[in-house]
């Protein structure tokens, strides 16, 4: 069984036991959260597609870690004009482990 959930403006295909990295969620480490924007579920009986979400479906996940991704460098410059701007950015993320898919 797998499900497609939406969080942080992205969609993720998840199964029970999967570990995913999502955009930062306001939750404590080792707490359990519910992702209720379930767009699709593939069960033994068949495929259930929501319009736009599946009614009554939830995905329970455990928060494993709150962290920051690897740093990316943004470098802007204009040739011949002595304009250089270097900036770094680390995107915050939340590491989740999928515990249960309720359909």
UniProtKB/Swiss-Prot annotation:
The keyword Ribonucleoprotein applies. Keywords: Ribonucleoprotein, Ribosomal protein, RNA-binding, rRNA-binding. The keyword ATP-binding does not apply. It holds the Pfam family Ribosomal_L21p. GO terms for biological process: translation. SUPFAM superfamilies: L21p-like. One of its GO terms (molecular function) is rRNA binding. GO terms for cellular component: cytoplasm; ribonucleoprotein complex; ribosome. Belongs to the bacterial ribosomal protein bL21 family. This protein binds to 23S rRNA in the presence of protein L20. Part of the 50S ribosomal subunit. Contacts protein L20. This is Large ribosomal subunit protein bL21. It comes from Clostridium kluyveri (strain ATCC 8527 / DSM 555 / NBRC 12016 / NCIMB 10680 / K1).
